[in-house]
Amino acid sequence: MSAREVALAARRAHDAAPLFAALGDTTRLQLLMRLSARGPESIAQMSEKSAVTRQAITKHLQVLSDAGFVSGERRGREHIWRLRPQRIADVHAQLDRIARQWDHALERLRAFVEDDNAP
């Protein structure tokens, strides 16, 4: 890997770390899945029949918002939250890059082992 490729990989990892950190919580993942399945909802709707308090939901949504996964909009006294699918696509693309890197590394290992065992 060239110095340029190493620098690019480091920058991508630096950019991706907050995204994966935001996804590293069960409650936040549940909120994302809920918004994906049901569409935009208020905090009041999300807290109905939930063991999580409105305050906790608000804090989790703020983390997701800071990472770009959701956006909120005031409608009167309510704050309506919606999923931002592009950010999910960004994470998917990052995971694809990581998978390709592993595929290449495994291919190099396979080639090395086969060359080492050649007569």
Could you describe each region identified by the protein language model?
Residues R12, E107, A111-P119:
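Short, charged, intrinsically disordered terminal tails
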Residues S2, V6, A10-T53, A67, ...:
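N-terminal helix-turn-helix DNA-binding core of bacterial DNA-binding proteins
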Residues R84, I88-F112:
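C-terminal structural segments of small proteins and small subunits
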Residues L61-Q62:
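Short, hydrophobic-biased segments on the C-terminal half of alpha helices
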